[in-house]
Amino acid sequence: MIGITANADEFVYKSFTTADIATMLGALCAFLLFNSRFFHLKQAAVFLGDAGSTAIGFCIVYLLIDFSQGSSALISPVTAGWILGLPLLDGSAVIGKRLLSGVSPIKPGRDHIHHILLDAGFSVNQTVGTLVLIHSLLVFIGVSAKLVAGFYADMFLFWLFVSLVFLRIIMTNLISRYSIASAKR
């Protein structure tokens, strides 16, 4: 009887988590609808802000940690990192670059990838489209490699992600040097 109760408790917990995910996805879809510029809107109608971004990030990370831990883990921790994809890659690269430069990692700056694209002349829609494409590619690589290679993919995927962070730092340095050299001409 205790085993049935424990299984029912876990089922209710997972169902509650599923309801939470569905609610969060619905809210995010509504936000994206009001924030898109596809309906001839010149600017976003809703501003998410720091608190909203932090809350969404916390919920996503909480769910990924929950799904990647324990005996009934649905995904591996490395796959969770690839699902986070672009925000994790960009944040790691920016923090790494700032630390290597001797700058505080929490100092504001225009070295995030969306700033780089906007400064390079991309429109807001082009920037969003590019970021969605890059993130989708990262998620596809992480999830498909895990499905194909199974357990042995974790170490490869981890080092591939670390390599991408360093590649992002190098590319950002090259772009900024090229931009500075072009501006001096």
Model-assigned labels for residue ranges:
Residues 1-184:
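Alpha-helical transmembrane segments
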